[in-house]
Structures are given as structure tokens and as C-alpha cells.
Amino acid sequence: MPDVPSTLSHDWAFAVFLLGVCGLIAFMLGVSSLLGSKAWGRSKNEPFESGMLPTGNARLRLSAKFYLVAMLFVIFDVEALFLFAWAVSVRESGWVGLVGATVFITILFAGLVYESAIGALDWAPEGRRKRQAKLKQ
């Protein structure tokens, strides 16, 4: 059991760190509000676009396929993170780690094959319709 004075010294050091961070944030916000410009007007509230007046709404509706690509990127990015951690410790993990990594890669590859089979990765609607017709037969 750790002695109480050393535990308290670590807690106090963390509390001082948090106070320092909060103080630094307050200082930076205060200085920027004091030194920043205070001119208000209609032109200050409009976005700057090369000196041209904005036309239309800036909000665009994107296809759901872009969100699918973003989700696939996140999934396979996390996969790469786990595989990097395994690759760094491959000697320490031994055969058990190799089997675990193989199972992990196999499950993710099966998911990728399934997404491709149902047409989730197709950008063109024709290919998706053809694959779905084949799956229904």
C-alpha cells in the first residue's frame, strides 16, 4: 500500500497542473478579448469569399455514400492501429498473438467481402442492382 504523503504529493501536483491549464486558458481568452477588434457591422458577420458577395446557402447535401466511405475509413484505420500495436509486440506475443491477429484480420476481411457482395461499396447504381438481382436468385 503506498504511503499517504507520496499519494497526496501526486494529487497536489495534478491539481497545480489543472490550475495552471485553467489559468493559461483564461489568460489567452482575456488577452484576445482585450486586444481583438471590436468593430461590429453587417460586413463583419458575412464570410469572406475573395471579395465577392456570397450567393446562396453554403450548406450542401452530400450523398450517403460519402458517409459510408468515411465510416469504412475509420473502421480500417482502427484496424491498422491494432495491427501496428501487434506488429510492435510480435515477438512478445508469440503464437497466441499471431493466431489472434489472424482471427482479427479474417473477421474484418469477411466484413469487407460481405459489404462488397451486397453492393455497399458500389458507387454506380447499376452495379448494385445487378448484384442484388443475383443475390435474390
Curated annotation (Swiss-Prot):
Quick check: keyword Signal in the entry? no
Q: Which UniProt keywords apply?
A: Cell inner membrane, Cell membrane, Membrane, NAD, Quinone, Translocase, Transmembrane, Transmembrane helix, Transport, Ubiquinone
Q: EC number(s) of the enzyme?
A: 7.1.1.-
What's the protein's topology in the membrane? Multi-pass membrane protein
| Pfam families with a match to the protein in the record | Oxidored_q4 (PF00507)
Q: Which GO terms describe its molecular function?
A: NADH dehydrogenase (ubiquinone) activity; NADH:ubiquinone reductase (non-electrogenic) activity; quinone binding
Q: Does the keyword Translocase apply?
A: yes
Gene3D superfamilies in the record, alphabetically?
NADH:ubiquinone/plastoquinone oxidoreductase, chain 3
Please provide one cellular component term from the Gene Ontology annotations of this protein: NADH dehydrogenase complex
Reaction catalysed?
a quinone + NADH + 5 H(+)(in) = a quinol + NAD(+) + 4 H(+)(out)
Q: What is this protein called?
A: NADH-quinone oxidoreductase subunit A
Source species, please?
Ectopseudomonas mendocina (strain ymp) (Pseudomonas mendocina)
Instruction: Tell me the classification of the organism that encodes this protein.
Output: Bacteria, Pseudomonadati, Pseudomonadota, Gammaproteobacteria, Pseudomonadales
